[in-house]
Amino acid sequence: MGDLIMGTLALAAKITHVPSMYLSELPGKNHGCRQGAIDGHKEIGKRCRELGVDTIIVFDTHWLVNSAYHINCADHFSGVYTSNELPHFIRDMTYDYDGNPALGQLIADEAVKLGVRAKAHNIPSLKLEYGTLVPMRYMNPDKHFKVVSISAFCTVHDFADSRKLGEAIVSAIKKYDGTVAVLASGSLSHRFIDDQRAEEGMNSYTREFDRQMDERVVKLWREGSSKNSAACCRNTPTTATAKAICMTR
């Protein structure tokens, strides 16, 4: 008998993980500044519950890798996180989630079949990055969902392989006995503003080009034009998010 198709991909989304979401919770001048984004994440978590999702896969654009595609699928993730990039934004943030080693290994196996160099890891000391931790904080505060994190800051990787990894994820979900959501976590255009102008960059685009490109891609998504939107993403400076989007197409 052939493989039974059992699993369901119930939801896929491009999401933000802007670290000021955590600042938004804290007392001070930035309190409430990202409430809209927080509410949006909570809504995605609500929709996932309504759809019966048991596991969320997150493409994390802050997990930098220089060789192969990597899948963090430990049995459990817990700890206290401070961002080494932005310790003044995210400091001492606690987290506690269950992982899904079986699904992570399925993804790696399916990717290898397609010629992609992919590896699944069930390593307690391999921690999550904030591209995963920020959305899970608001979507998954009660540990309702298992979490699988996939590296998406890929420095030497080919778009064709990223596309194959996306295909492998679809194949793995079909072989998985459960219901899955997939999130591409990261901005479209993503360029930090010059340091001396950091304060003004909190609530504005760094460049007009970035604003126009983002609006163009979102328009294409709304029109259902995935081919053209992928081409736009492929030509933006921020390849990590573009690759994550390519994986989820």
Regions found by a protein language model. Give the residues of each.
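Short conserved catalytic/interaction loops centered on acidic-Pro-aromatic/His motifs
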Residues: V180, R191-Q196
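Flexible, D/E/H-enriched segments
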Residues: G2-D54, V65-K164, K175, D195-R249
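Catalytic metal-binding/acid-base residues of hydrolase active sites
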Residues: H62-L64, L188-S189
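Beta-strand elements within well-structured catalytic alpha/beta cores of enzymes
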Residues: D54-D60, G178-G186
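Non-transmembrane, aqueous-exposed alpha-helical and coiled segments at domain scale
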Residues: E167-K175, V180
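Histidine- and/or cysteine-centered catalytic micro-motif in compact active-site loops
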Residues: A152-T155, S185-S189
